[in-house]
Amino acid sequence: MSFNHFDDQGRAIMVDVSGKQPTLRTATAAATVAMKPETLADLLAGRTTKGDVLGVARLAGIAAAKKTPELIPLSHPLAIHHAAVDFETEPETGTITVKATVRAFERTGVEMEAMTSAAVAALTIYDMCKGADKGITIGDICLLFKEGGKSGTWQREEPA
């Protein structure tokens, strides 16, 4: 296994993608937020003191996709053509699954943008609900799907 973010002397580098042809790149990532079922019930009913939690988390996730190169030092600045954040809620378990999809016509993939988007949306949910539930956890941040480029299509086989 080789890591392409290092040169021959072991120094960190940004991978040179200048010789690659742009192709349509898509990635979907997920993050899981677990809270008390009553906290999620209040969130879904609009009974939070901080307003539209999922709406704000959606915007935070979209903004995060666009800001990824400022947070992940060796990621490439990309022209994002699409970013979306959706939520699947399970009221009986108090679980929210954040799903972020990013698309771009670029020379490198958008996996980091999708994962950053999902993670920041999950962190925003935590931030807006922590006053009501200190035990909220965030977990299972993972890539679910990627498409485009030399390596083609990849899909996670086991549930995240």
Swiss-Prot record:
<dbReference type="InterPro" id="IPR036522">
    <property type="entry name" value="MoaC_sf"/>
</dbReference>
<comment type="pathway">
    <text>Cofactor biosynthesis; molybdopterin biosynthesis.</text>
</comment>
<feature type="binding site">
    <location>
        <begin position="74"/>
        <end position="76"/>
    </location>
    <ligand>
        <name>substrate</name>
    </ligand>
</feature>
<dbReference type="InterPro" id="IPR023045">
    <property type="entry name" value="MoaC"/>
</dbReference>
<dbReference type="InterPro" id="IPR050105">
    <property type="entry name" value="MoCo_biosynth_MoaA/MoaC"/>
</dbReference>
<feature type="active site">
    <location>
        <position position="127"/>
    </location>
</feature>
<feature type="binding site">
    <location>
        <begin position="112"/>
        <end position="113"/>
    </location>
    <ligand>
        <name>substrate</name>
    </ligand>
</feature>
<keyword id="KW-0501">Molybdenum cofactor biosynthesis</keyword>
<dbReference type="InterPro" id="IPR047594">
    <property type="entry name" value="MoaC_bact/euk"/>
</dbReference>
<dbReference type="InterPro" id="IPR002820">
    <property type="entry name" value="Mopterin_CF_biosynth-C_dom"/>
</dbReference>
<dbReference type="GO" id="GO:0006777">
    <property type="term" value="P:Mo-molybdopterin cofactor biosynthetic process"/>
</dbReference>
<dbReference type="GO" id="GO:0061799">
    <property type="term" value="F:cyclic pyranopterin monophosphate synthase activity"/>
</dbReference>
<protein>
    <recommendedName>
        <fullName>Cyclic pyranopterin monophosphate synthase</fullName>
        <ecNumber>4.6.1.17</ecNumber>
    </recommendedName>
</protein>
<comment type="subunit">
    <text>Homohexamer; trimer of dimers.</text>
</comment>
<comment type="function">
    <text>Catalyzes the conversion of (8S)-3',8-cyclo-7,8-dihydroguanosine 5'-triphosphate to cyclic pyranopterin monophosphate (cPMP).</text>
</comment>
<dbReference type="Pfam" id="PF01967">
    <property type="entry name" value="MoaC"/>
</dbReference>
<comment type="similarity">
    <text>Belongs to the MoaC family.</text>
</comment>
<keyword id="KW-0456">Lyase</keyword>
